[in-house]
């Protein structure tokens, strides 16, 4: 019997103006879909003119300049609508959605939808079940005592997954998809009996525990810092009085 992680998966990734999910903007995004291990990968790409300058530090990471985005990018409102509809369509088929560090990409998309569409990611999903698989959360739970960084590049190296063109949204999404397959194979005895819906719920619990552990480490190091326990989407911040 083929396990779900060898079957249909989709994966989503973004490149952005920075790391603040409340203020930064999406400049490119990609969704990849694959029906089975080794099957053809279908890629949908979006390029966005964010309407604000892209910091030099962000351009150094993903290579997208203000000039390139102004010439080739589309305005955010229709792009965010397309992205959200595409994610909803994929999830409606029952495909698990792979998102590396999901609270970043999905929260940023949610804030862009609120900014440009007066809507939310939950509004687009409506009754569509969201079954996210986050390779970062999986690896951190399943191999919790391993030292070292857990970036996409590091995890791909560890699990022997090719990553060509890191910090390109399509390349990162494709690598994240293969990374989930590789992690689930390695830890198959612990995961194969879980449905995607059950794994989604467990990851929310695991991520919250990981956030508490990181907060404790920060406090012990003398640099207290809050870590949001929400997964896969951070709640909207309350409006300022």
Residue ranges: model-predicted function:
Residues 1-27, 34-39, 71-241:
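DEDD superfamily 3′-5′ metal-dependent exonuclease/proofreading module
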Residues 42-62:
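Short, surface-exposed acidic-centric catalytic microdomains
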Residues 64-70:
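Short glycine/proline- and acidic residue-enriched helix-loop micro-motifs
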